[in-house]
């Protein structure tokens, strides 16, 4: 960046946070093939009742701005889709209406609308889309305490939705399913002044008038009430039916109970005559006990909670009901994670309700818990990991406490091992995320401080190559082919082309052995140029002066059927074949063409003479390829027509120039397109499409992938969604069809690019993904091919390395745009402390370790962590952690490996106090130092030595500064920090740190929260309230001079220089901004010596809905041609800013963004166009003609269907200040999540001249991910 350049940034989210705050379960997806049938059923207003029995095996989770859908029917969390929205979700519930076969999702957001969603599944692709059924306005946009948008619950019979604000307002909206469509009534409101709502629940009253129970506080008297509100369906009015004054003010929780009459429990005394209506019950949670209360006030039954001895307060925070055939039970969780099984049983004599409770198990503290009909339980954790568990027991033998003895107390002891549950699957979370370090290497690797006890997370943006077999070859091969006869399901031969010979390996019964001897008909004393398989049993081997056709006989051996030689003095350059076609390129620039019929190889008499030597050939895999792609030495790509009935058969029909000579080619069919992949000798990878009608090449894209020539290879039959635990155990299910034959739609063609770094590219979710391929110890692959055997049924591959190794393995952990990183956890444990308590443990525990693995959950403990990069060694990082004993520990990581001390410890205690801030610096020497600022106002200096990957630490000294320092930074050969209103530079002394410079700061800087420096000359100071101030270091006077400050108050959390006069930062409210010194703003009064001369102007601004914690600049991320700015959010967000450099890029994406923000308006205009009316026939009725619109059925049109919640994303991104100079790529990337018809309509509205088609728009969006991220 330069001072005069305009900053325009592209922003996208690489990993979304998982702070789940809302959830519900149901049958959400509707097959789109049955949608038309449902809409066509208009025989009656109501329509037929749904006869489908709901399984409710789908889980809907929501963060503040994203909805996720999972299927748990297979015992795992299978993701069906993610849908970010441009609003903050305040509450969420569901509706299971009688005449609707699927579940409707209901959302309340700060857009001011009540939104109803329908999930539709494509029966062909299996992809799930969202359709907005209604956006019912209930208030203005924004978050207000009087607006009913917080507590939302749905009637158990799904007739209406109750919701209330924090104060005063309560509302009810009726909903029904008629003629295959959702009908939503107008909101009905009730006002309760001076009432604050703490919690609410919808009562089960069968088909009586819906009832809502709420815990309320009278703000004037501080009295607590349990209030019951009734929606009178006859009067269409929301009424207060009854309220109970509560004496105990520790109440915090309320949940509904089932209709107890169905379980032979008396709900009214015998003398009560009104037995027809249902008397609903609720359970209220107090500090240490539960109470069962009914609406009429006849019963109030209490029972004590089993509590821990070490805690003083226990409160219920969530609960769920699970109904059995003739019974039910309630599962509740306390604020300590303890789960209780609660039951309501009838008294043996009076049949009055009796409350019983028992301790069930312990899980991490959750926002909510859900029980599925399959016997699985899911806890929705806002922090840490959420678990999908299976009931091993219902706890029938648990010790129970009943309401017969309401004063009885019981104490429990908990463990990290589950007793009645076993873990099936989990969703990990990085929330809270406070620090990270990103490497400048490829692939992008991030060390993230997730603040979880004894854990450190490494995130890698690469596909994993899992090595199974490795062997070193006697000579380094140049090429590799794996041969699978089309009639066989597994590979049988491996060909290795050496410099002067060919080696053949045979796969037999799971072993790889040398294939040689006199019976071998293949050529072994010459290097092979090409090896391939044709028709059912033919193998083609091509050398420089010979072409062989080898037939595999039925009884096993191979025999030679054809031996073809080129003309005298002419050699073969290269060749390629598919199942029926073979093309050979000769040194005299001629192209020979063969076709095989019934194992007979027939040559076409005509030959094509090229202007240049052909060094690579590609055909479509399969029976017949209509075109052949030729790569020529004159840096061109030429298309040869092979359509026998075409008038231009066997002629060049198209030519595409390249930027360098091609090295390898690949021609394949991907979904509906023909694609060409070209690896060039300059290290550039090119992909393009081929027009199937005339053979022309279009949609050309290039990417630099390495410093060596690029070898492209195809791996077909790759299952991207495959998991290792899906494999059958040996000996089981032998009668089943092999995995790779089950579903053709499950497989995705994958292209591997081998250069100085290996890459893979594939299409997932209609988006192109290009990611590095990560191997063990960074091995560079040279050539790779598919490899399927009886032991490796899916994703297997065989490759050779640049060092002459033969690797057999499989590809795993594929990435997508919504899942950009693979996660790995490091365990940070002091081995001495760990082993001290385990010396006398029984040796048999090791045998039970695998059995208990599914019964242990991660104890959610938080420790403050900071990750630092060494100032001189980029491969070395430090992890500073707070221990459970309130000490400070250090761990070091180099090249993805934890370094250990001479004693074998990976964790070293470096201070007996808790750190507050840390900094890595060298004080102008070659020695590594860590400076720790403690809570007591000390600076502790630790020296670090790393020799032969052995970590050594040494305490140097400590310095009292008598102030709590929150931020430090290495400044040249000194340490910069802010102490008591001064900028202080420290130098290294023998006994303590020495103050080298002290500069007084302006008085408005009161508490410094962030510091950063630029090249030892500029210092940026971020204040907790007064934004950023930039200082310049005056070397002559050894002091700092104030250069610029901000006129806007910002609560700074982090700041980072991006050039000498510009900084990027974030504030505590979730905004990211770029500030630059405005040197034209010299309007300050000279007499005010403490004020800065210039001001900072805001270049960029955008609301992110996550508090930025740290920024890092990564130069040439994943070998891109420009730097990127990575940032992390407190809730676990990982985002990326990419500068848009060219004017064309800036105009293009600005046009996309402005049009995207107007889509709701454009959609409204397209659906409400005035009809053309003949003025002569109207006879002056202009007013009536003026109001005639195209869409006469206004109920079919839904406002805000494109934004999904009725709010454009630019308004959302401008929550605190207008969005400026940042392209919201995260929103533009969501195009493929819309219905196909909406995708085409959106693409047609883009204003750019070339963006009228959907694929063109997708191309521009894909370029940002594939080229720069």
UniProtKB/Swiss-Prot annotation:
Pfam families: Beta-prop_RSE1_1st (PF10433), Beta-prop_RSE1_2nd (PF23726), CPSF_A (PF03178). One of its GO terms (biological process) is mRNA processing. The keyword Nucleus applies. InterPro entries: Beta-prop_RSE1/DDB1/CPSF1_1st, Cleavage/polyA-sp_fac_asu_C, RSE1/DDB1/CFT1/CPSF1, WD40/YVTN_repeat-like_dom_sf, WD40_repeat_dom_sf. Keywords: mRNA processing, mRNA splicing, Nucleus, Spliceosome. It is found in: Nucleus. Involved in pre-mRNA splicing and cell cycle control. Associated with the spliceosome. This is Pre-mRNA-splicing factor RSE1. The gene is RSE1.
């Amino acid at each position: 960046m330069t001072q005069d350049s305009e900053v325009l940034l592209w922003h996208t989210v690489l990993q979304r946070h998982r702070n789940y705050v809302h959830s519900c379960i149901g049958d959400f997806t509707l097959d789109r093939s049955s949608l038309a049938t449902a809409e066509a059923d208009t025989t009656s207003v109501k329509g037929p009742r749904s006869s489908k029995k709901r399984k409710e095996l789908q889980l809907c989770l929501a963060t503040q701005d994203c909805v996720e859908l999972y299927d748990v029917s297979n015992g795992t969390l299978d993701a069906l889709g993610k849908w970010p929205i441009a609003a903050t979700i305040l509450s969420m519930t569901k509706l299971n209406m009688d005449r609707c076969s699927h579940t409707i999702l209901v959302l309340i957001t700060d857009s001011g609308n009540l939104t109803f969603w329908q999930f539709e599944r494509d029966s062909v692709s299996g992809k799930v889309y969202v359709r907005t059924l209604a956006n019912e306005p209930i208030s203005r946009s924004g978050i207000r305490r009087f607006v009913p948008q917080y507590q939302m619950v749905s009637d158990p019979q799904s007739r209406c939705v109750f919701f209330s604000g924090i104060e005063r307002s309560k509302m009810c909206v009726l909903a029904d399913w008629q003629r295959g469509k959702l009908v939503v009534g107008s909101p009905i409101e009730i006002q309760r002044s001076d009432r604050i709502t703490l919690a609410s629940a919808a009562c089960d009253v069968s088909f009586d008038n819906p009832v809502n129970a709420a815990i309320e506080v009278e703000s004037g008297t501080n009295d607590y009430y349990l209030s019951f509100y009734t929606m009178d369906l006859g009067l269409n009015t929301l009424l207060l039916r009854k309220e109970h004054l509560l004496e105990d003010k520790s109440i915090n929780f309320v949940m509904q109970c089932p209709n107890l009459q169905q379980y032979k429990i008396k709900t009214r005394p015998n003398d009560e005559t009104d037995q027809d209506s249902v008397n609903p019950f609720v359970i209220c949670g107090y500090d240490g006990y539960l109470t069962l209360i009914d609406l009429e006030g006849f019963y109030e039954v209490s029972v004590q909670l089993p509590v821990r001895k070490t805690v003083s307060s226990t409160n219920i925070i969530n609960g769920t009901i699970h109904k059995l055939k003739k019974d039910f039970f309630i599962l509740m969780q306390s604020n300590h994670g303890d789960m209780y099984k609660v039951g309501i049983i009838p008294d043996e004599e009076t049949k009055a309700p009796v409350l019983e409770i028992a301790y069930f198990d312990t899980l991490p503290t959750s926002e909510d818990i859900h029980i599925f009909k399959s016997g699985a339980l899911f806890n929705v954790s806002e922090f840490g990991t959420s678990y999908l568990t299976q009931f091993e027991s219902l706890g029938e033998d648990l010790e129970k406490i009943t309401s017969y003895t309401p004063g009885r107390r019981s104490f429990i002891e908990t463990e990290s091992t589950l007793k009645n549950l076993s873990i099936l699957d989990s969703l990990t979370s990085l929330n809270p995320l406070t620090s990270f370090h990103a490497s400048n290497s490829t692939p992008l690797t991030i060390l993230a401080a997730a603040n979880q006890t004894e854990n450190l997370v490494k995130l890698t943006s690469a596909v994993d190559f899992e090595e199974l077999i490795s062997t070193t070859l006697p000579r380094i091969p140049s090429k590799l082919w794996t041969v699978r006869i089309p009639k066989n399901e597994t590979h049988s031969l491996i060909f290795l082309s050496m410099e002067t010979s060919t080696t053949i390996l045979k796969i037999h019964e799971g072993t790889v052995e040398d294939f040689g001897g006199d019976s071998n008909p293949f050529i072994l004393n010459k290097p092979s140029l090409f090896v391939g398989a044709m028709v059912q049993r033919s193998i083609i081997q091509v050398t420089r002066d010979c072409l062989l056709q080898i037939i595999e006989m039925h009884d096993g051996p191979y025999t030679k059927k054809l031996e073809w030689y080129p003309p005298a003095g002419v050699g073969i350059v290269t060749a390629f074949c598919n199942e029926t076609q073979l093309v050979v390129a000769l040194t005299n620039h001629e192209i020979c063409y063969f076709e095989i019929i019934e194992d007979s190889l027939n040559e076409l008499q005509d030959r094509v003479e090229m202007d240049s030597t052909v060094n690579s050939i590609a055909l479509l895999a399969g029976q017949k390829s209509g075109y052949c792609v030729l790569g020529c030495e004159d840096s061109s790509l030429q298309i040869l027509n092979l359509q026998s009935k075409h008038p231009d058969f066997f002629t060049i029909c198209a030519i595409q120039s390249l930027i360098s000579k091609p090295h390898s080619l690949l021609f394949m069919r991907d979904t509906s397109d023909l694609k060409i992949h070209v690896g060039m000798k300059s290290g550039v990878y090119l992909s393009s499409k081929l027009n199937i009608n005339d053979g022309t090449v279009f949609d050309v894209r290039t990417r630099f992938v390495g410093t060596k020539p690029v070898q492209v290879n195809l791996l077909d039959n790759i299952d991207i969604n495959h998991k290792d635990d899906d494999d059958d155990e040996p000996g089981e299910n032998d009668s089943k069809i092999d995995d790779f034959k089950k579903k053709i739609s499950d497989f995705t063609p994958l292209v591997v690019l081998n250069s100085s770094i290996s890459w893979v590219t594939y299409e997932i979710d209609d988006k192109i993904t290009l990611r590095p391929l990560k191997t063990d110890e960074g091995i560079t692959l040279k050539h790779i091919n598919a490899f399927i055997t009886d032991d490796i049924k899916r994703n297997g591959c065989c490759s050779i390395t640049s060092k002459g190794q033969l690797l057999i393995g499989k590809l795993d952990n594929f990435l997508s745009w919504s899942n950009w990183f693979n996660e790995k956890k490091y365990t940070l444990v002091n081995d001495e402390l760990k082993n001290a308590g385990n010396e006398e443990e029984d040796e048999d525990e090791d045998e039970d370790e695998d059995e208990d693995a599914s019964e242990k959950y991660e104890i959610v403990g938080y420790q403050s962590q900071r990750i630092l990069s060494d100032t001189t060694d980029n491969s070395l990082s430090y992890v500073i952690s707070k221990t459970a004993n309130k000490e400070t520990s250090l761990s070091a990581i180099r090249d993805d490996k934890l370094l250990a001390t001479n004693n074998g410890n990976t964790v070293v205690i470096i201070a007996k106090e808790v750190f507050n801030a840390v900094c890595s610096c060298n004080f102008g020497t070659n020695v590594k130092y860590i400076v720790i600022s403690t809570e007591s106002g000390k600076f502790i200096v630790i020296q670090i030595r790393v020799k032969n990957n052995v970590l050594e630490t040494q305490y140097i000294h400590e310095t009292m500064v008598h102030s709590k320092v929150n931020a430090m930074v290495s400044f040249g050969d000194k340490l910069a920090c802010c102490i008591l209103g001064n900028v202080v530079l420290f130098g290294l002394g023998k006994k303590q740190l020495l103050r080298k410079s002290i500069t007084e700061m302006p008085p408005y800087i009161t508490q410094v929260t962030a510091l950063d420096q630029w090249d030892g000359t500029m210092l940026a100071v971020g204040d907790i309230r007064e934004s950023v101030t930039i200082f310049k270091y005056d070397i002559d006077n050894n002091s700092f001079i104030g250069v610029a400050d901000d006129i806007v108050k910002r609560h700074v959390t982090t700041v980072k220089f991006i050039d000498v006069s510009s900084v990027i930062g974030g504030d505590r409210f979730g905004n990211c901004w770029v500030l630059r010194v405005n040197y034209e703003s010299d309007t300050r009064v000279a007499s005010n010596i403490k004020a800065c001369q210039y001001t900072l102007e805001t270049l960029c601004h955008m609301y992110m809905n996550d508090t930025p914690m740290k920024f890092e600049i990564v130069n040439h991320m994943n070998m891109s041609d420009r730097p990127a700015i990575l940032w992390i959010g407190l809730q676990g967000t990982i985002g990326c800013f990419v500068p848009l450099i060219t004017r064309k890029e800036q105009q293009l994406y600005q046009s996309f963004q402005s049009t995207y923000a107007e889509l709701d308006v454009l959609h409204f205009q397209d659906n409400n166009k005035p009809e053309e009316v003949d003025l002569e026939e109207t006879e002056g009725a202009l007013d009536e003609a003026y109001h005639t619109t195209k869409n006469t059925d206004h109920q079919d049109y839904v406002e805000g269907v494109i934004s999904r919640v009725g709010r454009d994303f630019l308004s959302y991104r401008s929550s605190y200040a207008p969005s400026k100079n940042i392209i919201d790529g995260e929103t533009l990337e969501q195009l493929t999540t819309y219905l196909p018809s909406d995708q085409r309509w959106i693409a047609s509205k883009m204003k750019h001249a070339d963006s009228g088609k959907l694929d063109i728009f997708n191309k521009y969006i894909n370029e940002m991910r594939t080229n720069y991220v």
